[in-house]
């Protein structure tokens, strides 16, 4: 079956993306041939804006309430970081769109800050009684930093040239054209890693849903974090779907090539909707963040 993995042929000789939008080519290294491609680039940039802003409300909420270690599940944060790390590695290896690589880099950086805050408040509120959680957070922070620096030390792709926009397609069979280029093993590994990252994204929400249910409270968790992530995932997935397939590549092959990243963005929306309903269900009758923090410290002092 490996013999059937082929990439579409290059679009041919000529100038680099002659009919494309120049600003998209310069900014993202993508060839936007028509309004559909330009719209995809715009939605992708908006999604990055949502992701960039999403973590800020949670950072503020953490500093305001001081109970981030109780409000957020460590397994939610670790699962999120694990998915983002694999997403970054998979995007790089599978020759994904530059926008996907840039978004993955920001994901990891924001996760590292979030885990650092979690470890800080865990140590502050529990002293030496939370060594395992803090060690796990530190380990993942180091792993995330090393992975991000390794990826950033390489180019995310070659300089734009006529063949750079040929794209690659898994299971693209029977394409006409002389000498189709085989899909590399590296790209297949990247596709597999991207698939695993999608599973981690889906599973990461479950511990947070359980934590909210167990506490019967969402105090200390910023609703804007999930609202902006939901909007960002929706825009991100739509931008990938909106983009035209490369010449010689069918719509089905294009979707298959980007499927893990689509599941990782659009697939988690249903779970984020559940968390949004929890904010509505627990908004009345729940203790304030200050009361919960005082109770937490009193409980720790009695132990």
UniProtKB/Swiss-Prot annotation:
Segments on the Lumenal face: 1-38, 95-96, 153-182, 242-260
Compartments (UniProt record): Lysosome membrane
Bilayer-spanning residue ranges: 39-59, 74-94, 97-117, 132-152, 183-203, 221-241, 261-281
Record keywords, A-Z: Amino-acid transport, Glycoprotein, Lysosome, Membrane, Repeat, Transmembrane, Transmembrane helix, Transport
One CC-aspect GO term: organelle membrane
Glycosylation sites: 13
Membrane topology designation: Multi-pass membrane protein
Primary location class: membrane
Notes on the domains: The di-leucine motif mediates lysosomal localization.
Family stated for the protein in its record: Belongs to the laat-1 family.
Record-given protein name: Lysosomal amino acid transporter 1 homolog
């Amino acid at each position: 079956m490996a013999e059937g993995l082929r990439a579409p042929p290059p679009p041919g000789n000529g100038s680099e993306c002659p009919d494309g939008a120049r600003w998209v080519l310069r900014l993202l290294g993508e060839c936007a041939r028509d309004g559909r491609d330009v719209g995809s680039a715009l939605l992708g940039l908006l999604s990055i804006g949502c992701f960039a802003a999403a973590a800020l409300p949670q950072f503020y909420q953490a500093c305001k309430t001081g109970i981030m270690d109780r409000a957020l599940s460590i397994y939610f944060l670790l699962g999120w970081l694990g998915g983002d790390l694999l997403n970054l590695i998979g995007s790089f290896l599978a020759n994904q769109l530059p926008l996907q690589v840039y978004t993955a880099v920001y994901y990891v950086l924001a996760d590292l800050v979030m885990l650092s805050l979690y470890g800080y408040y865990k140590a502050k509120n529990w002293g030496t009684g939370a060594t395992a959680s803090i060690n796990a957070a530190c380990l993942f922070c180091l792993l995330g930093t090393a992975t991000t620096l390794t990826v950033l030390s390489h180019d995310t792709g070659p300089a734009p040239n006529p063949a750079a926009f040929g794209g690659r397609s898994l299971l693209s069979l029977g394409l006409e054209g002389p000498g189709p280029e085989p899909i590399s093993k590296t790209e297949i590994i990247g596709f597999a890693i991207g698939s695993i990252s999608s599973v981690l994204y889906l599973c990461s929400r479950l511990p947070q849903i359980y934590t909210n249910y167990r506490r019967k409270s969402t105090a200390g968790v910023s609703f804007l974090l999930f609202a902006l992530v939901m909007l960002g995932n929706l825009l991100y997935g739509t931008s990938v779907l909106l983009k035209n397939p490369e010449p010689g590549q069918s719509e089905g092959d294009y979707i298959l090539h980007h499927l893990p990243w689509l599941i990782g963005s659009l697939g988690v929306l249903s779970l984020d909707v559940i968390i949004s309903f929890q904010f509505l269900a627990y908004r009345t009758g729940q203790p304030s963040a200050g009361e919960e923090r005082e109770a937490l410290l009193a409980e720790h002092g009695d132990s």
